[in-house]
Structure formats: structure tokens, C-alpha cells
Amino acid sequence: MNIDLKYILNKTVELINIPSPVGYTHNAIEWVKNELKGLGIKNFNITKKGALIAYIKGKNSNYKKMISAHVDTLGAVVKKIKKNGRLEVTNVGGFAWGSVEGENVTIHTISAKTYSGTLLPIKASVHVYGDVAREMPRTEETMEIRIDEDVKTDEDVLKLGILQGDFVSFETHTRILNNGYIKSRYLDDKLCVAQILSYIKYLKDNKLKPKTDLYVYFSNYEEIGHGVSVFPEDLDEFIAVDIGLVAGEDAHGDEKKMQIIAKDSRSPYDFTL
């Protein structure tokens, strides 16, 4: 099988450039839908939950497999508009606040307007706060967004149309290096989405069918633990494709190989698979 790496790379970058924190994934799902249409896939539906499930007829209809990848990412939601015109946010998905300190962010309003800002500690300057700035724990309560607008009060912010509940996405810093490495946020799991699309493209380009009937599930709530929570009734086998942690303290994984996960924090996986 010849893998179209250029296609995978291009589609990965396209999808990474579409902000899709959990709960704000409609644009990413719409992109996937259009990509599938371009690949000749007509049999698909968008669930009430906002995920997309495609169906590809295979050589054997007596056995049905499903593969999945997720379009949702980590992000944040506006929790509070402060009196000083700054925003307190709550995390969406699990991440360390220190990993996004100083990050450029985009605030997505209900009216589809966007505003840029910076996520910083409430006491950011060492020149002003000394060791307090260095040693203060980075938590939801000690981090805030400074909006890139002339706002001094909560009323100023409200006039922009920014409200509690607005979604916040982080800058991705996507870089394609000459040696083949990719540096970016949200390779988990948008790279895997692109890989699945490349497999469908391979089938189309070579006029092939998968060995069995195939469901392809693009989920949108994986980062908070219920990405693929419902399966088609006739499903026999399910494989989730994800960017996992293979280089932990006690792991013997390899970042350049596929890993088959035996167990996560919730449950062991199926031995026969």
C-alpha cells in the first residue's frame, strides 16, 4: 500500500487550522463531511451529538468493523468576565495551565465574531510581583485572558459581544520541518483523522473495497471521555486510532510504530482484537 504522505500532511494542517475545542466542533465536522463527499462517500450521517458516522460497503457484509478518530481538542470556556475587563476561563479537557501560559488565544462569540487575547497569570510580571510571579500555582483561578482590545471594565467586554460560555481556542504553532517532523498542537487527533481520510482516498483511487463492511466514526467528545459512547447495533469490531502516550516512565512504546493498547485508566481492552 502506497501512503500519500503529502495528502495526509495537507489535510492534517487544514484541519488543525479549524478551531474545535470540545463543544465547538461543528466547523471541523462540516470539513470532514465535505472531504468525504469529495472522496465519493455518500452514505453518512451526523448524529444528534454532532459526530459523523460514514459507512463503506465491503467485500464481506457478514462482519462489520469500525475505525474512529476524533476532531475535538483541548480548549477553554469563558467562566467569568472580571470587573477589570479580563476573562477567567475554565478548562475543557485535561491539561496543565502552565503548558498554555503566555499563549495566544481566540475567543469565539455566539455571534460568530472572534477576538484575540493572551492567557497569563493574574500576577505575571516578575518586575512587579517578584517571586510571587514565579512561585504562584497556575490554576483556573490564577490565570486570565487579556483581550487584545481597549477594555478596562466588564461593561467594555460585554459591548464587544463576549459572554460567559464563549469558547476559547489556543494557537496551534503548526510547523512542518524539512526533516519530516511536524510540530503542532492538536496532532491528537487531527493527524489520525487525516490518516483515515487517506485510507478512504486509497480505496477510491485504486477502485478497491475494504475486506468487510466498514463504519468510520469521527467523534467530537473524546477529550472529555465520551467520544464514541454508542455503537451501531450490528458492529463486530471497533478500533480507535489516536495519538497516545508511548514514552511514559514504565512504557516500552515507540513513537515511530503503531501501539496496541492493553489497558488505560478505566479498563483493559479486548484480548482477541
Model regions and ranges:
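N-terminal hydrophobic/helix-forming segments and targeting peptides
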Residues: 1-273
